[in-house]
Amino acid sequence: MVTKSRKTSDRMLKYLLLKNIKKRKKIMEEQNTPIWWLNDESEQMLNRGYLLKGETVEGAIDRITTAAAKRLYKPELIPAFKEMITKGWISFSSPVWANMGTQRGLPISCFNVHVPDYIEGITHKLGEVIMQTKIGGGTSGYFGELRNRGTAVTDNGKSSGAVSFMKLFDTAMDVVSQGGVRRGAFAAYLDIDHGDIEEFLNIKEIGSPIQNLFMGVCVPDYWMQDMIDGDMDKRKIWAKVLESRQKKGLPYIFFTDNVNRNKPQVYKDKGAVINASNLCSEIMLPSTADESFICCLSSMNLELYDEWKDTNAVKLAIYFLDAVLSEFIDKTEGNYYLQGARNFALRHRALGLGVLGYHSYLQKNMIPFESMEAKMFNAKAFKQIQEQSIIASKELANIYGEPEVLKGYGLRNTTTMAIAPTTSSSAILGQTSPGIEPFASNYYKAGLAKGNFMRKNKYLAKLLEEKGLDNEDVWREIMLNHGSVQHMKELSQTEK
């Protein structure tokens, strides 16, 4: 006679061996552990670099949530963390999927270094960036302190300029991968009033020795106002910036004074200057020679906002991210090239809880992207996330203490929010819309680092099905119209 426990064991073994995603989902539903977002595309994404060898998606979720609860000394939170991810309320960043709760890599997503104007400091920061990339991070650096090309240096020679040193970082990105998951990526930031700005704007041009770097210009108020007022030299440079953005999508534009006017109060009180952003330009934090800013990221799924809005999901997300930060701090102890990042993590504990699925929520509820209703939802959702994340940070400070920078502020984290691009994360989470961006097309091929996938707008498909129009001829017509439905007379203006 086969016992109930033996039957359960055999059934789970059979489940783990099944290759067909539909059969797997059926078994999960029978066991009351559905992961609705786990389809062919999301599973392929995860299996191509985010899971350990032989690990299932469910095993990865167990690994990550158990590690987070352990860092918080709160094992009772494991079921709540699991519910958050299996229901699709939260999306982990790529390094969290790949490295949280493992002996490899680190679970932090982004870093920035402040490159000083002396050779020992430059080479040390290069070492930092290589190590940050190796363990799974996207990186950036501020080069504004480096002297212009041709400036005298102490040995009676002349400086080769900021851009020449960027070549070292460019080469590093060509040979170092992010924890084996993807090629390294680095953004170089330079002030628009730096003497090497025109050389900098030629990065990634045909014939340029620098082809792998991303780039950003830091623009102060005085410079922008002079340009607007008619300074011809500045207008020529601004024209080159705009031309470069049109041709290459770069540089990012970082408005230095605007950022520093709106930085957290603690940084204003302590006179901390924010010079640059991160690789994806969503993080604004201070870096120095001794501290390299980091920010650990994950995102709330706005597509399912109505499911989690009346729960403690945001609080749990902040608790989770603080646990990720604790794992980073523990794992980096004793690592020479990560001490700058570890110093920042210990002293600031900056978090970046963002969102994805914004456009999917609007489409799900038939709300036009530029409507007043969309603006009202935008304000409501982000107000809630901001308020609840601050409450959570205060709770964490009461439980675990304030970090050095926040002594006397009653907070655990200098920042709690950031809007990351989430291209891979949204693909994993049921192909919801990335970040706060709109879908560019209703029918297209998504070319991602982990593969190419054909995408149909699921809410459009549902609408077409209701109208009896969900067929290949209609979709072919949509494809020929570059993914647009504006030509379809069968749809109302609101539906379009």
Model-derived features: where do they sit?
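Extended catalytic cores of very large enzyme megasubunits
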Residues: 3-7, 13-496
